[in-house]
Amino acid sequence: TGGHLADLGAEVIKIEGPTRPDLTRNGGLFGSFPENEQGGDWWNRSSTYNLLNRGKESLVLDLSTERGRELFKELVSISDVVMENFTPRVMRGWNLDYPNLKKIKPDIILVSNTGYGHGEGPYSSYPAQATTQEGTHGHCWVTGYEGEEPAKAGRSFVDFLSTWTGIFAIGAALRYRSRTGKGQWIDIAMYQAGAMFLSEYLMDAISNGREGERIGNRHPHRIPQGCYPASGEDQWITLSVGSDQEWLSLCELMGQPELARDTRFEDVISRYQNYDELDVVIREWTQTFDKYELMHMLQAKGIPAG
């Protein structure tokens, strides 16, 4: 969140503890150091650290000490927004929660980014990480291929959902403060952000009793959609047909216009019911083309591909 705010021109100060620095400093991801060399100041060289902390100033404060907390309060007194991602007990334990920060600066905006929010629920005190969140709010259940076990997303996207939520909330809070002179406490729960991303599955479960299913790269009503082999070893192309007109265009491009009249594939319901057979037809065709050549051919016909 802070990196995006810095991109927009905000002065952002990142605070780290002397014994608990930012975990992305260690360059644990393969290849995260320039030229794969740690260098003498390796703690400042990790690409992940520099990406997430771009545009920020750095400050070390030991908030477990009285002196550290006093310095933090001085910083709060001249700040517009404070962001923290501790579990709920931490800021309360330091007397740095919203009621106490308001005493220092009445119009302060506090952003608390936790796993499950600051409510009274049984999960409230639980720490969180994006991968575990995917399992808790149900995303893993609908990710993966039919007949296989649940899977996580390729990247840990829940962190970014809470980031974007925070950015919009901060903008709204600043606007509100400019009109009313009042600050706000923005309580973001990663769980809520992730559950929002599954809203159609949740509504389907509530309304129809369906639990959702794993369908890999397929889509329930954009058919065909998938990642198909192209010519060459381990070369692939994705395409997504969103209407009967796009399906007709694809059939013509494949040189098989009769497929559009085939009762197995003539409309989206038929194509859904015969998805396996359809995938075989598409796969046999795509694997005869270079992936880039085929992408341009499909795009020229108005069919999303990449």
Q: How would you describe each model-predicted region?
A:
Residues 1-179:
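N-terminal helix-loop segment corresponding to the beta1-alpha1 unit
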Residues 19, 115-117, 190-195, 232, ...:
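Glycine-rich beta-alpha junction loops
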Residues 30-36, 206-213:
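Short Pro/Gly-enriched beta-strand edge/turn motifs at strand-loop
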Residues 39-41, 49, 213-220, 226-227, ...:
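Short Gly/Pro-enriched turn/cap motifs at secondary-structure boundaries
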Residues 118-119, 147-156, 178-194, 210-220, ...:
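Conserved Rossmann-fold dehydrogenase catalytic segment
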Residues 131-134, 161-168, 219, 241-245, ...:
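Conserved active-site and cofactor/substrate-binding residues in soluble primary-metabolism enzymes
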Residues 144, 163-183, 196-208, 251-258:
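Oxidoreductase and adenylate-handling cofactor-binding alpha/beta cores
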Residues 224-305:
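Aromatic-enriched alpha-helical interface/lid elements that frame and gate functional surfaces
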